[in-house]
Regions:
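Stable alpha-helical elements in mature extracytoplasmic
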Residues: 3, 7, 28, 32, ...
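Structured beta-strand-rich core segments of catalytic domains in phosphoester-bond hydrolases
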Residues: 2-5, 12, 18-109
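Mobile, glycine- and charge-enriched loop segments
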Residues: 1-2, 153
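Glycine-rich, phosphate-binding/catalytic loops in enzymes
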Residues: 35-39, 113-115, 173-176
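Catalytic domains that recognize anionic headgroups
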Residues: 2, 9, 16-21, 27, ...
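A solvent-exposed, charged loop/short amphipathic helix patch at secondary-structure junctions
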Residues: 111-130
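Generic structural signal for well-ordered alpha-helical scaffold segments
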Residues: 8, 86, 145-149
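Active site of divalent-metal-dependent phosphoester/diester hydrolases
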Residues: 44-61, 128-152, 156, 161-206
């Protein structure tokens, strides 16, 4: 589609050696490798996708650097996960974690519609979704952090954390690492503007 083409054009323009994508969706899982190869020439793709009736979605890591190993960290009762790739450049070895922590799964348009219609059932369901996400995410974070702690090489963490810089998620994932945006960015660095124009929930920890 034109939208997908414009996104891939932007990604290619960044000229990054490693790219981490979350919530990547494709209708035909069988065509994923050829699709990525056509859009991201020169990159090797590592991924884990959850198949569904309407397609497949998951995490994708694209790399121009040699990949010496890979793995996944699946979360209990969740369609979210983390994948990692091991790399070797000269004598330097390191691992990149590509994380997607529990989402709230809340429809903004659905909330607005419920507000106008005074639909209390939707608000009750929203509360249940928020509670589930708030309970699951710290467990997922601890699971990834435990894997990082046992990692024999330097680890970098990227991903959609679905949490703000004042959260337990952020505190845990910055242990022993620096927030790349704080080190080199400026302004608020919003990555999700639908609910709040200054919300940052996506990170690169180095």
């Amino acid at each position: 589609s034109q939208c997908a083409d414009s996104i891939f054009a932007f990604i290619n323009a960044q000229d990054a050696d490693i790219i981490c994508l979350q919530e990547f969706y494709l209708k035909d899982l069988q065509k994923l490798k050829s699709y990525l190869a056509s859009k991201m020439k020169g990159y090797r793709a590592e991924y884990y996708m959850f198949p569904s009736r309407n397609g497949a979605f998951g995490n994708v890591t694209l790399s121009r650097l040699p990949v010496t190993g890979k793995g996944k960290i699946k979360f209990e009762e969740s369609a979210n996960l983390a994948i990692y790739t091991d790399h070797k450049v000269g004598d330097c070895r390191f691992r990149v974690y590509n994380c997607h922590f529990e989402s709230y799964n809340i429809s903004f348009t659905g909330m607005v519609r419920a507000l106008f219609n005074a639909d209390t059932d939707v608000f009750a369901e929203t509360g249940t979704k928020m509670k589930r996400s708030i309970l699951r995410r710290p467990r997922q974070v601890d699971q990834v952090f435990s894997d990082i702690e046992s990692c024999p090489v330097e680890a970098f963490v990227c991903g959609d954390f679905n949490d703000n810089p004042m959260s337990y998620t952020y505190y845990r994932m910055t242990r022993g690492r620096k927030d790349a945006f704080v080190e080199s960015g400026e302004g608020f660095g919003a990555t999700y503007s639908l609910l709040w124009p200054m919300l940052r929930i996506d990170y690169v920890m180095v």
